């Protein structure tokens, strides 16, 4: 039985990861760092910006200028303003779901709120929004998901996590929650390889049109 549904944001509710990846690849190329979209997906997907920057510094020995983050975020939000979309059928799912739900994202509060606003989901940027800034350890640690459960007074075993990234799946597994992997984002290759050990979801689905087919009890009865 599920009492709380926890949605990731980027790559689940909104089709943002492909835009973010392309912008990061381009920004780092300006400093002589050559990575591709596959590298971003394998190493950075589902992680917070500070964690990503820490790994870049460690792996490439690169000290980015103090204004790099501000400039990257400004370019990213400009790209979001013209290209960000909500995942198909997400709005319908959020309107019909019959239990408490929230969002748990590695994005900053400002970016998450702005992104949700761009796709008409600004009403979710209040108490339903939980970000990595609220916990000591971000994904793949379970801290953020466990915080969601705690704030809702829900047993983690009765929580359902909807994730796209391996790090998010790992976090959900570590939290002792049921995890469904959404594979319909533009950033994920088709066909998608099997997940490695330690990052196995309980179920997969590639469109929110079939979300309630996976467990009809999640849908509000009319």
Regions found by a protein language model. Give the residues of each.
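Asp-based, Mg2+/Mn2+-dependent phosphohydrolase catalytic module
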Residues: 1-3, 95, 108-222
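Conserved SAM-binding loop
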Residues: 13, 86, 101, 161-162
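Helix-loop "lid/cap" segments that line or gate small-molecule binding pockets
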Residues: 27-28, 48-63, 115, 149
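Short, acidic loop-to-helix structural element flanking the phosphoryl-transfer center
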Residues: 78-103, 109-113
């Amino acid at each position: 039985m599920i009492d709380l549904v926890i949605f990731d944001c980027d790559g689940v509710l909104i089709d943002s990861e492909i835009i973010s990846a392309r912008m990061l690849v381009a920004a780092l190329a300006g400093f002589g760092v050559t990575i591709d979209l596959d590298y971003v997906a394998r190493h950075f997907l589902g992680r917070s910006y500070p964690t990503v920057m820490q790994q870049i510094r460690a792996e490439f020995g690169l000290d980015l200028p103090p204004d790099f983050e501000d400039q990257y975020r400004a370019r990213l939000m400009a790209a979001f303003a013209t290209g960000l979309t909500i995942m198909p059928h997400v709005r319908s799912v959020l309107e019909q779901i019959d239990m408490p739900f929230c969002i748990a994202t590695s994005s900053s509060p400002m970016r998450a709120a702005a992104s949700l606003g761009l796709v008409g989901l600004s009403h979710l940027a209040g108490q339903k929004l939980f970000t990595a800034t609220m916990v000591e350890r971000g994904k793949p640690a379970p801290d953020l998901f466990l915080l969601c459960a705690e704030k809702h007074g829900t047993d983690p075993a009765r929580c359902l996590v909807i994730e796209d990234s391996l790090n998010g799946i790992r976090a959900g597994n570590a939290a002792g929650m049921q995890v469904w992997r959404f594979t319909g984002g533009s950033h994920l290759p088709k066909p998608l390889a099997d997940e490695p050990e330690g990052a196995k979801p309980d179920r997969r689905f590639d469109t929110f049109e079939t979300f309630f087919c996976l467990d009809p009890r999640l849908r509000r009865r009319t």
